Amino acid sequence: MTISLYAASIPVFKQMLNAMSGVLTKAEAHATAKNIDPSVFLQARLAPDMFPLVRQVQIAVDFAKGVSGRLAEIELPKYDDSETTFAELQALIVKVLAFVETIKAEQIDGKEGIEIITRQGTPKEKRFTGQAYLLTYGLPQFFFHVTTTYAILRHNGVEVGKRDYMGAF
């Protein structure tokens, strides 16, 4: 069985971004119902040396945007990562979903062998083929930050479960 780069990326990003949006909606409702300042959740971390929830969401959506755009070899929209509220995070997800939805299968399929160069926060660069970039770097990074977003909220008492994490499929 073969699977196209498009099938392994765009539908996955859409499903999980929508699911993450749903988890954030539940978190905001939980904060309201329990009279908890939303910043308690937005700034929560799993460990002191990890990013807070806001940054986890920003990084997750950045990977969905970046991986999709790099595979399609198109210019990436730039966002300033200044979100501080649930509403602003939801708006960011909506923007990235809109961008991801513009990418068509013919823009990605057949790009398994293109070269993608990353500079992961340092001057060092890493070179990937399109396929390796998606499967060994992009998707694992995306899922790490989506999962960490979920875990932060669940750890802090938000009633979310596996169905919330996975969303509609």
Predicted regions and their residues:
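Helix-adjacent hinge/juxtasegments
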Residues: 65-106
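A broadly conserved amphipathic alpha-helix scaffold signal in soluble, globular proteins
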Residues: 25, 94, 98-101, 144-154
